[in-house]
């Protein structure tokens, strides 16, 4: 009788032990591969512009003790006509609360840059601000979810002081530079 109980116990352990081992291996693979992390994207809310080829880079400078956040992005014009970029902003503010950098010359980022249809420009060192206009401070390996906001004119606009605004949703991991 005792042999049968031992055999039943061994069969139980062998059957369910393999199942438990398989579950542990699947959980370990999920933790290692992290499929739940959002991909790095840059997606404009309206057609005519792209910025995900290559994905934007968000970084902090090693020499910057405060950990101020900066962005590099490549802006492609597919709007069908030449545009002139006036101002650029990186922010984590909700869409309706985007700070207006045009009112503060200290936050002016990009001079007038012409982009013809099908061409691109690289925006480098774009500082990131929160909804109050304060610099965003972060650290390496954090995930950034925010917006790239661009004020621009079409080359043939009647009044260049009236600017168009486009916003791109950006998700990226923060790296360290320098």
Model-derived features: positions:
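N-terminal export/assembly leader peptides and their processing motifs that target proteins to secretory
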Residues: 31-178
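N-terminal leader/signal peptides at the extreme start of proteins
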Residues: 1-8
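Hydrophobic membrane-insertion alpha-helices, especially the h-region
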Residues: 18-31
């Amino acid at each position: 009788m005792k042999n049968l109980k031992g055999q039943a116990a061994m069969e139980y352990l062998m059957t369910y032990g393999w199942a438990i081992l398989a579950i542990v291996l699947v959980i370990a693979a999920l933790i290692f591969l992290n499929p739940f992390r959002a991909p790095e994207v840059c997606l404009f809310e309206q057609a005519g512009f792209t910025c995900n080829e290559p994905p934007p880079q968000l970084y902090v400078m090693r020499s910057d003790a405060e950990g101020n956040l900066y962005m590099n992005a490549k802006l492609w014009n597919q709007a069908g006509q030449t545009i002139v970029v006036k101002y650029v902003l990186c922010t984590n503010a909700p869409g309706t609360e985007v700070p207006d950098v045009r009112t503060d010359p200290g936050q002016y980022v990009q001079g007038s840059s012409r982009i013809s249809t099908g061409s691109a420009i690289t925006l480098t060192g774009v500082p990131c601000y929160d909804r109050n206009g304060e610099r965003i401070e972060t650290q390496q390996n954090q995930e950034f979810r925010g917006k790239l906001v661009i004020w621009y004119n079409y080359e043939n606009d009647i009044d260049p002081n009236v600017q168009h605004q486009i916003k791109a949703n950006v998700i990226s991991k923060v790296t360290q530079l320098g």
